[in-house]
Amino acid sequence: DSKMKEINDLKDKKLGTISIGDSETQNKALTDIEKDLGSKPVTISYSSYKKYGDDLYNGNVDAILVNEGSRGMFEEEHSDFNKKTRVIKEYRYETKSKALAKGVDVTEDPFNVYITGIDTYGTISTVSRSDVNMIATVNPKTHQILLTSIPRDYYVPQPCQGGQTDKLTHTGIFGVDCTVETVENYFGIDINYYVRVNFSSVENIVNALGGITVNNPVAFTASDGTYSYEAGDVYMDGSKALRFARERYNLGGGDRDRGKNQMRVITGIINKAISPSIITNYTSILDAVSGSFQTNMSNNEMTSLIKMQINDMSGWDIEQISVNGTGNASAWSPANGFNSWVMEPNVNTVKRAVEVMKKVENGEDVKALAQQVMEENTADE
């Protein structure tokens, strides 16, 4: 019912702004709004997404300024936000990522890759919450990969929020630089590279590979009813793999089990990507998925790694572990501006994970140890 149809309708009206998150981009938008209106907008600042949305609904402000990366924050408190609101003007800004890469010879030296998945479809450049958080520790000499899953709600200090503690997923709102730096600091490790994907990326990559096979330990049906997954090896196209990786409500371990399934999808992607029929045709595959992901690994580094595999063609041992913690339903979330459910880290599981990473880097076989760590974590759940 709002009379706000275009940006000029905002003249002399009240515009809500938020004091949480990316203030630099918000200030750029306010400058551009002033140019469009010919005068400074009347602004009211908020420190809580709930109050921000409430006042828009109640008519206490005529419009609010929303970073698309934080749209999900509104949906947590206002499930009908997308239906009840409209966009009257969109401003786009590009920000260069920091030079995060700590380059190594990827065919000789071990390295860590941070895999971050944001909770959106469409263009990969969109900033949003980091819902998939995983460290891949790779040793190219021993052909061993360790995947370490970190829960999205892990409650950790975040440099992009002035060192305040918040859910790991919220680092994605500030960009991949923040996510990587947060994990490096908390785990005490170097992350050499990152790979950033979204929902569309997963579908595109899996489909470009001709589908993948995923080992599913427990049969379940997706909570939205779209797919049923039998126990055992399951062939999946992009849509089915994405739904498998996103499901948590119909899994006994909730978000913990979702993290394990995400690692199973990554394992399926890696195994298919290094298969002879795919890797020998790598240029067409890379062309097919171009624009589906972001990474700071150079083309030369990726090509060197691929050519090493083509010359060798030996298999890779991919192990999976995760870190754990305890749920807290009322911890302060600076990004939300209210108390939220978080996972308080079990520091011992973090130390254990780093121990396994170091062994992979040192060329040790960690198959038995990784299985032991997963069993220890399962016992703590």
Show the residue positions of the predicted features.
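Non-catalytic, solvent-exposed segments at the cell envelope interface
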Residues: 6-7, 11, 16-21, 27, ...
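Gram-positive cell-envelope targeting signals
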Residues: 1-4
